Amino acid sequence: NNHMNFASLVRGGDADNIATISNGNLTTTRSASKHAGPVTGTAIGPGGKWYCEAKVINTGGVQPGITATTSDWLWDTIENTLGFYDDNWSIIASNGNKRNDDSGSGVSYGSAVSADDVVQIAVDLDNGKIWWGLNGTFFASGAPADGTNAAFTNVLTTVPYFFASSMESGGSIEWDFGQLGFAHTPPTGFKAINTNNIAEP
C-alpha cells in the first residue's frame, strides 16, 4: 500500500521553473529566485473525497492546492502561479486568500500562514468542493464532513487532479498524504491518498 508523493517534476513549460524534491519525495523546495516553482504528484480522481496536509517550512511564495492534470498551467511558460487558470485552485500562504481563475492577489478567505504551520486540504471530487484549514481548524467555518462552507464549489468532477504548489525563492513544504501520520484528524468520509484507497470504487 503506497502513499502519494512527488515522484516527478511535471511542470515542463519552462526549464528554469522547477523545484527540488527530498525527504522521501515529500518535501518540495524552491531555491532559485525565479517566480514560481510548482511540483505535482500522482493523480487522484475523478471522484472520491481526499485529504492531505502541507506543513509549511518556509512561506516564500507558497500557494498549495490542486490542478487538473489537463491544465495549461502545467506547461505555462509565463510562470503564472497556481490558481491563475480556471482549472486550478489554491490559497496564498502569505495572506490566506483563495485563488481560482484569478490573475491577481486572490479573494479574502483565511489567515496568513507562518513557518511550521500545517495547512489542511480537503477535496470532494464527488461534489466539486475544496476546503483549506490551518492547524486543525478549517477556514471560514468550513465543514468538509457536512459539505458546507467550502472555499470553492466549482471543482470539476469529471477529471483527475494533481496536488501542487507554486513557490518562490525559499518556499518549502513538507507534504503528508498519510504516510507520516496526520497532525490532524481528517474530516469524516475523507481518505488518505494511497493505492488501496485510490483503487476502491
Residue spans for each PLM region:
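PRY/SPRY (B30.2) beta-sandwich protein-interaction domains
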Residues: 1-201
